[in-house]
Amino acid sequence: IVSTQDSDHYGHAIKAMNAGYDLLLEKPVATTIGQCVEIQKTAEKSGRKVFVCHVLRYAPFFTLIKKELNSGKYGKIVTINHTENVAYWHQAHSYVRGNWRRSEDSTPMIIAKCCHDLDLIVWFMGAKCKRVSSYGSLDFYTEKHAPEGSSAYCYDCRYVSDCPYSAERIYIKDRAMKGHLGWPCDTIIPEPTVEKLREALKRG
């Protein structure tokens, strides 16, 4: 199982296949097209199997959609409008503070998050994609949108009690203090407790 950070997938996958292992490879497969091609070539050369974790195909909600589309009752599907709704706290956790905050360590959101959605669309349509376009920019989570008098770290900030992105609220009050110490708390620190989380979050 390769479930490391995005930028590590390629190296770990190649080494595992060369060592004789079949792979369950967490998405995204790799961070560049060249790395993806190399993983495919290595799999073919070594006779290893690579399974990518596109798990949403097996969720009851999406299997029902696929069944309905395949039934033909809706005719030919010409357009799919599919939205990836990332909750504000999830955005703050994963893509501002978390493991996917730096482009050097991860992939763009269309790959890191939306590859599930792209996989579903291809699966729903039963055909290969001919073209993909993606556009966007970093706009909201920037220094110019920070409230006046805010600080670099949550726990030093005058708005910590009212901010929707408050680390104290997201990790401590809404989760740890209610006994929910799994994701996302356990991505901040192994075996989290309220005290350990606060200490880790205070250090940034």
Model-derived regions: residue spans:
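Structured beta->alpha junctions
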Residues: 5, 28, 54-57, 84
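Beta-loop-alpha module in the N-terminal Rossmann-like domain of NAD(P)-dependent dehydrogenases
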Residues: 1-42
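Predominantly a Rossmann-like dinucleotide-binding segment in NAD(P)-dependent oxidoreductases
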Residues: 56-203
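A near-ubiquitous, low-amplitude feature marking generic local secondary-structure context
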Residues: 22-26, 48, 103-104, 115
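Short, contiguous strand/loop micro-motifs
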Residues: 7, 26, 52, 104-108
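Rossmann-fold dehydrogenase core element
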Residues: 38-55, 75-82
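Small/polar loops that bind or transfer phosphate-bearing groups
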Residues: 1-4, 53-54, 112-113
